[in-house]
């Protein structure tokens, strides 16, 4: 009786695995969405805490703000999941992406207004809820591109792609904030987030 040998792990197996993922219809267009959808958020969100520190916020005050807004972000993710089931992938990414862009741009209102605790909490809560909604929509579409029995590896690759450009942009946000100022940086981040929705539109129109 001939025993079928399992394919040994190695670079060749890995390349064949991911080639199958990338050869799916519409996958290259989806990668362009992954690379760009969170760019505005990555650019702006990294500078929220430094901006508040520059306006006199203590570590304890920032910790409390982070805790409360993180809980709001979880709530936003739950709400986004419910709305995603009704709206579908395309409309969810557009709507939640628009809210995400508005949320990060609204941080410009906090420049010079760090002493207004109520305003800081209101805008930060809105931004985190919008971020949670947009993230869950993005992850849901990522799961739809995962192949049966390869979900873990396929999702991991997409997550790495999503973080690749966003991580580079986020790392440069400090230099841009010094050059442009906080207000301009947040407005630019919102504009980038809004502009990148055109990539979402193009991808889904091509997939129709």
What residue spans do the PLM features occupy?
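C-terminal ends and interior cores of transmembrane alpha-helices
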Residues: 98-115
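A late C-terminal transmembrane helix in Major Facilitator Superfamily
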Residues: 149-178
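Juxtamembrane intracellular "pre-TM" segments in multi-pass secondary transporters
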Residues: 2-31
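Intracellular juxtamembrane helix-capping segments at the cytosolic ends
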Residues: 132-147
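Helix-to-loop junctions at the C-terminal end of transmembrane segments
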Residues: 76-90, 177-178
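Short amphipathic helix-loop junctions that connect adjacent transmembrane helices
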Residues: 46-62
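Hydrophobic core of transmembrane alpha-helices in multi-pass small-molecule transporters
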Residues: 117-134
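Multi-pass alpha-helical transporter architecture, strongest
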Residues: 187-208
């Amino acid at each position: 009786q001939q025993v079928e040998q399992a394919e040994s792990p190695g670079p060749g197996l890995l390349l064949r695995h991911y080639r199958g993922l990338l050869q799916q219809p519409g996958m290259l267009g989806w990668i362009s969405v992954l690379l760009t959808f969170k760019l505005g958020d990555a650019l702006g969100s990294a500078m929220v805490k430094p901006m508040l520190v520059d306006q006199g916020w203590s570590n304890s005050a920032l910790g409390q703000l982070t805790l409360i807004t993180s809980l709001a972000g979880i709530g936003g993710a739950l709400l986004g999941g419910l709305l995603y089931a009704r709206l579908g992938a395309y409309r969810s990414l557009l709507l939640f992406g628009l809210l995400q862009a508005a949320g990060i741009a609204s941080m410009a209102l906090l420049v010079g207004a760090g002493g207004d605790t109520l305003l800081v909490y209101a805008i930060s809560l809105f931004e985190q809820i919008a971020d949670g909604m947009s993230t869950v929509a993005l992850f849901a579409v990522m799961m739809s591109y995962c192949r049966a029995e390869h979900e873990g590896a396929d999702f991991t690759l997409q997550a790495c792609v999503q973080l690749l450009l966003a991580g580079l942009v986020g790392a440069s946000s400090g230099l841009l904030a010094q050059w442009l100022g906080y207000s301009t940086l947040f407005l630019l981040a919102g504009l980038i987030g809004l502009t990148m929705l055109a990539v979402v539109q193009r991808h889904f129109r091509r997939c129709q």
